[in-house]
Amino acid sequence: PFFLYLPHTAVHLPLVPGKKFKGTSKDGPYGDWVQEIDWSMGELFKALKAEGIDENTLVLFTSDNGSAREKQGSNLPLCGRKGRTDEGGMRVPCVVRWPGRIPAGSSSGALTSTIDLLPTLAAISGGKVPADRIIDGRNIWPILNGKQKSHPREAYYYYQMDQLQAVRSGDRKLFVSMDSKKRNWGKPEGKKELKLFNLAQDIHEDNNVATENPEVVKQLLAHAEAAREDLGDVGRPGKGQRKAGWVEKASPRLLKK
């Protein structure tokens, strides 16, 4: 098996599409750069086909966060943007292709994460994940091939740097109360109250239904406390935290074409 990680810098600011793609869309530099990504992926598929491995290669295309500014595309109907724990900052598309293994044209509403890729790719390639440490992700191959509808994980946690800001289980998402809410840019926001949203009915996170659902709030607060105990929160180290990796004697190499 082979593994290729291809991180496009597009469409991150500054918007700099290649010369031959400028003016090829009706959406300015952003749209032009999207056109270039589309071309780039086409070249990748051509190469796979030329090598005769097109039918036996899993291709996964996704992103790391929502757009940061309007000129980088819209996050609607989601609320918020990059750097925030609203759905618009956290939720991204994921397109997966594997002819004969993943049904063409199928879709899934299951919530998954990039941390699931390690155990998933290991499972489908016949490998094993390390047994001497905790692996945070889960094997989501049954979701990708359409045999499973939901993720085995019971709760997801939304952190802004080292601050736990929200927790989600199913379609219910709770923003926990905070004396000061951290942000990526600018000063922290002021005190925040508990807010509960039903994402199945309120994808833009407009209607706080915490008062009407005390049992759901209680359940999600318990998940939040479990996260703090394991992963930590501001000024509170978690019992499950690992030390950052460190290379004592690094030997970087410059690859020249």
Q: Which residues does each PLM region occupy?
A:
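A structural signal for well-ordered alpha-helical segments within the folded catalytic domains
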Residues: G28, Q35-G42, T112-P119, I135-R138, ...
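Long, internal low-complexity/basic segments
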Residues: L117, S169, M178-S180, P188-K195, ...
